[in-house]
Curated annotation (Swiss-Prot):
Keyword NADP: no
Species of origin: Saccharomyces cerevisiae (strain ATCC 204508 / S288c) (Baker's yeast)
Annotated Gene Ontology cellular component terms: endoplasmic reticulum; membrane
Name of the protein in its database record: Cell division control protein 1
Gene: CDC1
Function: Probable metallophosphoesterase which may participate in recombinational repair of double -strand breaks.
Gene3D superfamilies: 3.60.21.10
Cofactor comment: Binds 2 divalent metal cations.
Assigned keywords, A-Z: Cell cycle, Cell division, Hydrolase, Membrane, Metal-binding, Transmembrane, Transmembrane helix
Stretches of the chain found on the membrane's Extracellular side: 61-391, 487-491
Superkingdom of source: Eukaryota
Main location group: membrane
Cofactor: a divalent metal cation
Membrane topology term: Multi-pass membrane protein
């Protein structure tokens, strides 16, 4: 055989190597692209599930729990008037003391900002639900509207005044009285800041006044200014009001409202079981505060006003005692209830308001000899606001769960796929008739079964990635924040 004429094709080793390099480069590029895609994968299905859980959690504590608290306070559950009686219903709010830069001066500014947001929201939400579900005919604030109001300049005070009215907007066709000052608003006694007192009365109204509501006379007395013994410009107005009221005719039952409680002997006049603190009522005084009004002034107030009942604030905790005072040669008694603070940051675990129901029909007669009414014309009930700290604890647990879930998904992907993704695939995937969705034969190995799971839409990448963890965590955070914003600003 002759081979000379056969053409020989000689392959170039150089071209072969270049082809191999190009092939490997293309494969490596594809692998790098697939890896980059895996790293940037966002697990929308799992993020949506966690988002729904957050929606349920926040809705429960910001709506359901609040409605439940209002339901427990419904007037019909504790009022005991004759059938068909139309009572006048009153809500008493003590020491809201909206937070400002004077509240916690040692804390970082960012911490104070978020604390203020939470406290303001608690006030605003509770006020809205009280006005909607309980719908009192009249609302009275018992002082300490602000925390550092006595120290602010006019510019800052106006800013906080606007903020206060945004938190507690007045309801149309309902009376809301905010004119009673507290020591955080103007100071106390000899240390009352006269300019702060004048500013407060200019915007909120006279600090000592009386008005009729529900066939009762409400007496708002600025006992703080009345206690000033050095500056007649401060004490003159409440002194004149008290003297003029004593000389006037007041046929209706009187209800006294004061910020600071009247004098008592805490060893003899105990506060009762509704008080959180087990210690006796404190009798203390200091710079711009005093826990009770002096004994002589207290007796003068009781004698001249002759209240059926009086309500005070300042202490932040509940206290109910009985006062006695002389009246026409006899001894008359009057209950005093120190109302719990409605704020969540006043050192008590359960903020509350005091509800007051008044029923005094025109045919009710007075016993002339003792100056007492033939029957009781008021009923009152302590109304607890929702536990603010339980909601915060649950949100922190929710945050911890969310972080752990996202971390488990990214740092233990094989375990996640074997446990979570398998269950999700079994529960949410519907058979569509394809053989790929049918149960695998028993002869097929477990490795093939696991391989089929990796193609499931619920499976996660089997490689660990901090970058992907951060991306999914940020996406979840950004998705949940609008829920908080909605409940904290709109609802």
């Amino acid at each position: 055989m002759v081979y000379r004429n056969r053409s020989k094709s000689v392959l170039s080793t150089h071209s072969k190597k270049s082809d191999d390099k190009a092939h490997y480069k293309s494969r490596s590029k594809k692998k790098s692209k697939s890896r980059s895609k895996k790293r940037l994968r966002i697990y929308w299905r799992y993020i949506s599930i966690v988002w729904i859980l957050w929606l349920g959690l926040i809705s429960y504590y910001e709506s359901v729990v609040v409605k439940r608290a209002m339901k427990k306070c419904q007037w019909s559950t504790w009022e005991d008037w004759p059938e068909g009686a139309e009572s006048h219903r009153v809500g008493l709010f003590a020491d809201p003391q909206i937070m400002d830069e004077y509240s916690y001066p040692g804390r970082p500014q960012i911490v104070n900002y978020f604390t203020r947001v939470i406290v303001d929201h608690y006030h605003r939400r509770n006020w809205k639900y009280v006005q909607y579900y309980l719908d009192p005919d009249s609302n009275f604030f018992l002082g300490d509207l602000f925390d550092g109001g006595r120290n602010w300049d006019d510019k800052q005070w106006i800013k906080e005044y606007t903020r206060f009215n945004q938190i507690f907007p007045k309801k149309p066709l309902r009376r809301t009285v905010m004119s009673l000052p507290g020591n955080h608003d103007i100071g106390f006694g000899d240390t009352v800041v006269e300019s702060s007192l004048q500013r407060f009365s200019s915007y909120f109204g006279e600090t000592s006044s009386s008005l009729d509501a529900g066939n009762h006379t409400f007496v708002l007395l600025d006992t703080i200014s009345l206690s000033d013994k050095t500056n007649p410009n401060v004490s003159r107005v409440p002194r004149q009001f008290l003297d003029n009221f004593a000389m006037g005719s007041h046929p209706l039952p009187r209800i006294l409202l004061t910020h600071v409680p009247l004098w008592r002997d805490p060893e003899q006049q105990t506060c009762g079981q509704l008080r959180e603190s087990k210690e006796p009522f404190p009798i203390q005084k200091g710079h711009q505060y005093q826990t009770v009004i002096e004994n002589d002034i207290s007796q003068e107030i009781l004698t001249k006003i002759q209240p059926e009942i009086l309500f005070s604030g300042d202490d932040h905790d509940h206290c109910q005692i009985s006062h006695s005072y002389p009246f026409q040669g006899k001894t008359k008694n009057a209950q005093e209830i120190t109302v719990k603070s409605c704020a969540m940051n006043m050192g008590i675990s359960r903020p509350a308001i005091q509800l007051l129901s008044l029923y005094n029909p025109s045919d009710l007669t007075m016993v002339n000899a003792g100056g007492e009414y033939a029957s009781k014309t008021y009923q009152t009930e302590l109304c607890y606001m929702p536990d603010p700290y339980k909601a915060i604890r649950m949100y922190l647990w929710g945050l911890l769960f969310s972080a752990a879930f996202i971390a488990y998904m990214h740092f233990f992907p094989k375990s996640f796929n074997n446990r979570v993704a398998t269950i999700m695939n079994r529960v949410f995937t519907r058979p569509d008739g394809n053989t790929s969705d049918l149960p695998l034969p028993t002869s097929i190995s477990k490795s093939k079964s696991k391989k089929s799971l990796t193609h499931s839409k619920y499976a996660v990448n089997d490689t660990r990635s901090i970058k992907q963890f951060l991306v999914n965590a940020i996406v979840l955070f950004v998705s949940v924040m609008p829920i908080f914003i909605y409940f904290y600003t709109v609802v």
